[in-house]
Every structure is written in structure tokens, then in C-alpha cells.
UniProtKB/Swiss-Prot annotation:
Gene: rpsM
PANTHER family to which the protein is assigned, alphabetical: 30S RIBOSOMAL PROTEIN S13/40S RIBOSOMAL PROTEIN S18, SMALL RIBOSOMAL SUBUNIT PROTEIN US13M
Organism in which the protein naturally occurs: Pseudomonas putida (strain W619)
Protein known as: Small ribosomal subunit protein uS13
Organism ancestry: Bacteria, Pseudomonadati, Pseudomonadota, Gammaproteobacteria, Pseudomonadales
Subunit structure: Part of the 30S ribosomal subunit. Forms a loose heterodimer with protein S19. Forms two bridges to the 50S subunit in the 70S ribosome.
Disulfide bonds: none
Its biological purpose: Located at the top of the head of the 30S subunit, it contacts several helices of the 16S rRNA. In the 70S ribosome it contacts the 23S rRNA (bridge B1a) and protein L5 of the 50S subunit (bridge B1b), connecting the 2 subunits; these bridges are implicated in subunit movement. Contacts the tRNAs in the A and P-sites.
Length: 118
């Protein structure tokens, strides 16, 4: 298994699919990385040379991925919560942030039902 951006990439899959195992790299970004690195997106990782894997590492390093991206997202959410704006309050209460209804549904965000206390 090749290791790119601190993630073990599966050897037996196409390069584009394997790169999506990195947090912050989707299909479009993976195709862009392959094009910039000059690597065939349909080639499997095990068939690539060490030089090609190094160029992929260099191209992935240009993007914000893994720990840095997770930290950025968490800092932005924390900033909203500190501001006390509507979106921050919704994050703090564990409710849907983007205007979805909560009378019914929203179970994923709210968690399991709590029994009514008397």
C-alpha cells in the first residue's frame, strides 16, 4: 500500500478512486491531481513507479487535506458558535443548520428520541 498524505492508499484500485480515500479529495480533485502529475487515472496504484507516486504526493500536498482540513472546518464551526449567530446556536444545540424542518425528521442530527418525563 502506498502512503500519501498520511493515508494508506489501496493498491488494487484505479488511481482516481484510490486518491479519494484521502479526506478532502473527491473525484474531481483526484482527476485534477492525476492530470497535473501526468499520471493515467485508469492505472492502478501498484503499477505506478516510485517517481509517479512522489509526483502524486507533491500534487496532493498543494491542497488542504486530512488533519489541516479537519482543523479548518472545526475552527470555522467554533467561530460561528463563539459569535452566537443563528448558525452557531444551531450547531451548539445539535439541530439542523441549513433550515430543514425539525417537527418531524431531523433524527440524524437530533439523535435518538428521548422519552417524555413527567
Amino acid at each position: 500500500m502506498a502512503r500519501i498524505a498520511g493515508v494508506n492508499i489501496p493498491d488494487n484500485k484505479h488511481t482516481v478512486i484510490s486518491l479519494t480515500y484521502i479526506y478532502g479529495v473527491g473525484r474531481t480533485t483526484a482527476q485534477k491531481i492525476c492530470a497535473d502529475a501526468g499520471v493515467n487515472p485508469a492505472a492502478k496504484i501498484k503499477d505506478l513507479s516510485d517517481e509517479q507516486i512522489e509526483t502524486l504526493r507533491g500534487e496532493v500536498a498543494k491542497f488542504t487535506t486530512e488533519g489541516d482540513l479537519r482543523r479548518d472546518v472545526n475552527m470555522k464551526i467554533k467561530r460561528l458558535m463563539d459569535l452566537g449567530c443563528y448558525r452557531g446556536l444551531r450547531h451548539r444545540k445539535g439541530l439542523p443548520v441549513r433550515g430543514q424542518r425539525t417537527k418531524t425528521n431531523a433524527r440524524t442530527r437530533k439523535g435518538p428520541r428521548k422519552p417524555i418525563r413527567k
